[in-house]
Structures are given as C-alpha cells and as structure tokens.
C-alpha cells in the first residue's frame, strides 16, 4: 500500500500476496498473503480496526472511553495502535506465558497490560477482562464473539483475495484460527463466489478442538462457558485458546471447512525458519504452522493446483520464544573462522 493517508488506521489491509518459489512442490503453485505488512505487523490490525469502527458507528463506544480486551498479544497490539490513533485509552489482559515482546510493544503504544496466571488459561484472561470492564464502565472488544471480527475480513481480506485471483484458479485456501475471524470472513465470500475452492484450517496437534468433534459449551451470549475438553497447553502462540470462539463456530455450523490439519510445534518452528531462510519471508510461529498445513495440502493436491495461505504476523515478537532457541547471539565457530581469515578488524575472541 502506497500513497498519502489521514491516519495510520487507514493503512490497514491491502497486504501483498507473494509466490512461494523455493519451498513449493513442483507440481503446484503456492501463494502466501503476508499480513505482516499491516502497520503493526499482524492480521489482527484488521480485527482491531473493524471492531473499534463498528463500535463507534453503533454508539457503543463513546469518545474517550477506555477499551479493554483479553488477548494473546497480536489483537492487543492492533488495538493499542488503533486506540492511540483515535484517542481511546487501552487496557490489555494477557496470560503471563505469552512473549514479553508483546507486552513491551503494547506498553510502548501507551497501553496498560494486565497479566493473568497461566493456570487460569484463556478463560481466565477473558473473565478478568470482563470483570474489569463491568467494574469500570469500559468497552470490551470481545474479539471471540464480536461479529465485527469476521465482518472486517469479509469486507477486506476476502475482497483482496477475490481481486487478486479474478479469472484465475484458486483451488485451496489455508488458514489457521485464533478467534476464527479470518477463516470465517474469507469463507463466507469463497463459499458464495468460489464454491469449488477447498477451505482448510489447521490447529495444534495437542489441542485439536475442531478435530475432536465435541461441542463447545456456551453461555446465553455465545461466549464459552468453560474450557473445551480436548484442549491442552501448546506452543503456537495466538492459536486455539482453550475454547472454540463463537466467531469460529460459524465456520463449523455452516460447513465452511473442508479439512482440519493438526500441526506440531516443532514442525511450526522448523517451517517458519524455512520460510525465512529459503523464501526471505520473516514470520512467526503460527505462520510456520499454517504454511506447514499448506505444504501438507500441496503434497497431496492434483497437478496444477493453486494454493493460497495466510501468514498472520511477523517474527520479531518471538525473539524470546523457542522459535529463536537455536539462533546464536554471538559468533559461531564458523563465523569466528571467517572473521580471522583476513587481517582487518578481527575481534578478540573471549577466552
């Protein structure tokens, strides 16, 4: 996206779709929609814009009112950006186990960050955010139930995909899910306008809630009333809370999803690194997981198939996580040898 804009929020969306050249099997064509090109580096910038602007239009959000949300980080970062641009104080409630980069980014944007114990899981952070909202008269974004979440993807992400592939094949669309906004919003349009496109989602292999088949118990307002019995802690940050969000439930109930592919954390880490080192695409853990699922589809797809996947964020907010566990900060033995192979500016090697 290029040009002049009245504020940073106007730059959300219109992200590039990039061909995969080195990692794609030879019999198919693979594309990736790189959501790191959003202003704060993730697909959740769309959600943040959509929810806040819908609440402004409905009158539910008043000028200067504090916004609060339970988030694994990317939604919080997006909301911190949108709220800063529009003049709303923002409070994020986040489980203590998510990366410290997320906390610092939100605080740098002026947000307050409340941490909840890991034992309380995602349900605990949601309950805490709801409690604080009710006690203080704050607006809660409710990303897991808010229809504006999927609506913004139907209005933006899906239309961008349709425009990019107008008159061309698009055999498979692959996306992970956190809230379900991307998969549901895009699927609405694909089912209506490209019904032959197969829609594939993916989830952690140790927390395969959709694959499990058991229903999510819900409160009267559609929010989850408890943790799903198939959930277990996993390392793919931003994916699959301990419940099936209402926004994702639409994709289940309406039969949008053709296949669910479980992916392990180890495969996710390795695939994210492969995207960086083979394609130059720097992205996070859930991107590695999504692309691993897309590769699974590609390997089984008929000759000539065209596969599009979403890569939801950037890798920089994972520096403190296991994604970077094998990446050295100091020079390796090979690098020391290279440095010493010519005489100029040789660093003294520690003893």
For each predicted feature, which ranges?
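PLP-dependent amino-acid enzyme catalytic core
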Residues: 1-351
């Amino acid at each position: 996206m290029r040009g002049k804009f009245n504020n940073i929020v106007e730059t959300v969306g219109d992200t590039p779709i990039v061909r995969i050249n080195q990692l794609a099997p030879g019999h198919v064509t693979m594309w990736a929609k790189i959501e790191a090109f959003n202003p704060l580096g993730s697909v959740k910038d769309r959600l943040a814009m959509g929810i806040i602007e819908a609440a402004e239009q409905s009158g539910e959000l008043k000028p200067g009112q504090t916004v609060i949300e339970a988030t694994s980080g990317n939604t919080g970062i997006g909301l911190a950006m949108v709220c800063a641009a529009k003049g709303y104080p923002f409070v994020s409630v986040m489980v203590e186990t998510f990366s410290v980069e997320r906390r610092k980014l939100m605080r740098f944007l002026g947000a307050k960050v409340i941490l909840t114990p890991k034992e309380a899981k995602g349900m605990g952070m949601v309950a805490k955010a709801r409690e604080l909202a009710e006690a203080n008269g704050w607006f809660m974004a409710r990303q897991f139930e808010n229809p504006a979440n999927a609506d913004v993807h139907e209005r933006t992400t899906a239309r961008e995909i349709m425009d990019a592939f107008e008159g061309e094949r698009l055999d498979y669309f692959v996306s992970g899910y956190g809230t379900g906004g991307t998969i549901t919003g895009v699927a609405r349009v694909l089912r209506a306008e490209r019904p032959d496109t197969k829609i594939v989602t993916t989830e952690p292999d140790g927390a395969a809630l959709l694959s499990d088949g058991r229903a999510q118990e819900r409160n009267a307002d559609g929010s989850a009333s408890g943790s799903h019995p198939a959930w277990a802690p996993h390392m793919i940050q931003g994916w699959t809370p301990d419940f099936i969000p209402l926004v994702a439930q639409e994709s289940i109930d309406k039969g949008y999803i053709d296949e669910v592919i479980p992916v392990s954390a180890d495969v996710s880490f390795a695939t994210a690194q492969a995207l960086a080192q083979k394609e130059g695409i720097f992205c996070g853990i859930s991107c590695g997981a999504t692309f691993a699922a897309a590769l699974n589809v590609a390997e089984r797809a008929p000759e000539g198939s065209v596969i599009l996947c979403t890569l939801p964020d950037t890798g920089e907010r994972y520096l403190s996580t296991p994604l970077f566990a094998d990446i050295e900060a100091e020079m390796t033995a090979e690098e020391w040898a290279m440095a010493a192979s010519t005489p100029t500016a040789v660093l003294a090697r520690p003893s």
